[in-house]
């Protein structure tokens, strides 16, 4: 024995040095772990997070749970998890599931932990399942256990405990019920619920835990202890394997605690047992912990004592083993410490065990029911939310279908009413008098034979874009419907465009077309005004033709263009009055807007005449009862026109801008029938141009054949396309006027913002001597659009319109300030720009309060 002990000392020293080197190596490499993490290694936090996600197992993920047994720490079940049979140990408290320090343990003789369930009410530990059960159960059965199997089990238990101690884990509850047999008949040490992680080599105070029959004396006495408590428990397990009996059977628990603690009670050894095995058991059951060998020594000793076991044959082993069991049963303990005097279990003890088992089962069933009720509640709540989502989705689908149906209906209703939005015309520079077109013009009253507009025609810039023949969108920059008195709301852009002929000769020629009186036509709602910048056909070749082919001469406005036809401005707002006369109630309503063709004077305007005090003479739109005269060129035969007449004008050449070198005298000599107006002198100032226009004399134009006149001032003679004259018609009172100009009632001519004398303002009034409406022919002019020269000039005009008695400089400053806040101008913008507000106020509260109020858009 001494030699064996001496030989065992060398491995002990080797293990000591090996452990020292291992600690040194671990300490050195631990310093470089943070640095190595920067070179491809995962951070520690990410590793822990990934492990935590796999460590937590939901209890409902485990299926087919079956009860296996119960103990002091809880019941044990087996079930299926991820196509694997697992053991589920149900514990009573959450802290018992805190075994993260054990999940890294990987040994063939240590049970593998798969995860924990830390969700209330089922606190469980999921581990590897061993189908053959506990070691104590296998030993008590009459199964055949060979010598090799017995020797292997002893060695495997020692190997497993040695692995735990190397990892600083103290089991503290090593016993045969916590040693399982796998399907391969290998040992699996389990039940680490009472294990302790040893952080120091010194002995520590441990709590009273474990089963008293396998408990070390120092633990019973609550003395400082270390890993040697597991060695004592291992000695008790060896005695149990040798005798196949429960240690200290039929002895009360308190008697075991007292007897083991005071060294009065011990386990007797069979006399016929192998000497080496008996010596190992006695060393492990030493009263002092320092006298017990470590598991590394136990492994070495067993390798020495094992040949003695194999000296016997298998039959001799089985006979000797049975005799060891009979010896254990014959052990007599004092009657004062036994429970039932060494007899079999009483009926009361069996009933008590049955009640405990039933109580554990009922508690488990209660917890499972509570868990599934909570899950059912969550499922019902999710179902209600999902049902609400489906209901909301159906409502939204119904609303969407209704909205699409209404949208289709609106598009069908406004298919002929809503013009499309088109891009603005390109910008080009013009100075002086402009000749947008020189051509022979054909006029026709047949709508079906309309000539499509030419792509790039300058006459498409008011209600239609210069780049396409479709109508513009309402309230867009170039749309004439923005400030129409008859247009109340915005309309969809889904309306159909005007028909464009597919004839290439018509599409790409210089011809153009206009529609008089149609909804959305240029004659009704375009910027054909004294400042719109569009060529006036009434004073040029249209007037010259004088009703050729039965056409009605169309009226266009003219002005001095500064930055081309692409610059658009805001429209004007016109006010409307109800017809007070009862005689006019049956007549169709007439809409009037500023800058419409009806406001353009068609006769000679006398700038020197004083401003009339009568509203009838001051209004731009003529009275319904005003004298009318039907022109000779009208093809309506004095009949009521059911719909608008169209005028198609075919152009032979493109328009050109006149030069100051044009010879007016030579042209007048060649065409004596044409009376020419004085040409506007070239100037770089808009104010000077307006003043020069006011100083020129008006010349009435006569029709000629195919020669364009020189352009006149913005205020000149115009031909009304719907002009009807009646004789001996008396002038009505101002109260019979249907519509009055919201601008003429509160301002003078266009250049009154720059006139320094009040006398010039009185002489610059625009008076219409003709009417745009008769009983035979009535047209509705809905929209208008005014193109200003620049933002500053536009602002000055607004300031003059809102004259409140201030000086000219104050009015200009106020206009500029208002323009900066409210006016936005772009040269070419196809999108509709919504302005903040357009306001017009009456300049005279006493005179025009009934006719012109504040209009806001």
UniProtKB/Swiss-Prot annotation:
Domain of life where this protein originates: Eukaryota
Catalytic residues (positions): 173 (proton acceptor)
Residues binding ATP: 68-76, 89
Keyword Kinase set for record: yes
Region (Disordered): 441-503, 572-625, 733-775, 818-857
Domain (Protein kinase) ranges: 62-304
Post-translational modification: Ubiquitinated by rpm-1. Negatively regulated by ubiquitination by fsn-1 bound rpm-1, followed by degradation.
Ranges annotated as biased composition (Acidic residues): 753-762
Enzyme class: transferase
Cofactor(s) needed: Mg(2+)
EC number(s) reported in the record: 2.7.11.25
One GO term describing the cellular component: cytoplasm
GO BP field: response to stress; signal transduction
Protein name in the entry: Mitogen-activated protein kinase kinase kinase dlk-1
Organism of this sequence: Caenorhabditis briggsae
Upper classification of the organism: Eukaryota, Metazoa, Ecdysozoa, Nematoda, Chromadorea
